[in-house]
Amino acid sequence: RTSRKREGEVRRVDPNASRRFDRVYWQSVAWIGHRVAVALQYAHDQRVLHRDIKPSNLLVDSQGEVSVADFGLAKSIDQAGISRTGDVVGSLRYMAPEQLAGAADTRSDVYSLGVTLYELVTLHPAYNESERAKSLIHGNAILPVRPSQIRHDIPSDLETIILKSINIEPERRYQSAEELATDLRRFCEDRPILARRTSPVERLW
């Protein structure tokens, strides 16, 4: 679903905020992620990649319905891998490493949604944009700190979902937006998630 209505736009919150969040907040973030993942799966089923998932492209109306906006950079899955290396398409801050190399696929959208969820739960950017630009250009992987190192009260299952979504190796991420949507829904329903928690060493490989 798309919309031009911007008043309900999901915005990044003050990174200096220090209040603790309750279970309702965490579940609200997870529910937003779930609805976006469902929308992405629909787009992927139509053979379309969004390629620019970020907070400003997620809209929430007065009824709590979530819409994915701005398909201006969307591309057919069948053509997404033929961009010339060096053609940066999307927002670097939310871009999967393989997307910069012109090798985007459905898991690249999963990655961008994961980075968006990271920022919504920590109220901090996942990456320093200038440092990340250098790392992507030179092929050096950098990892964001665990969300729980910034927000000590984040539920471990929600952190696990986010970290799996933003793994630098596409093969270690959720393999579809549907898989991500399933775990986010299970979290919202207080059911065990399917993803397992990864160690810091595993995140590097």
Region spans (language model):
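Intrinsically disordered, low-complexity regulatory tails flanking kinase catalytic domains
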Residues: 1-27, 85-86
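Conserved short alpha-helix within the protein kinase catalytic core
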Residues: 19-37, 41
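Residues at secondary-structure transition points
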Residues: 27, 83-86, 145, 195
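C-terminal lobe helix-coil module of Hanks-type protein kinase domains
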Residues: 34, 40-41, 45, 56-62, ...
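Conserved catalytic-core element of eukaryotic-like protein kinases
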Residues: 49
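Hydrophobic HxD+1 residue recognition
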Residues: 53
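Regulatory activation segment
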Residues: 66, 79-89
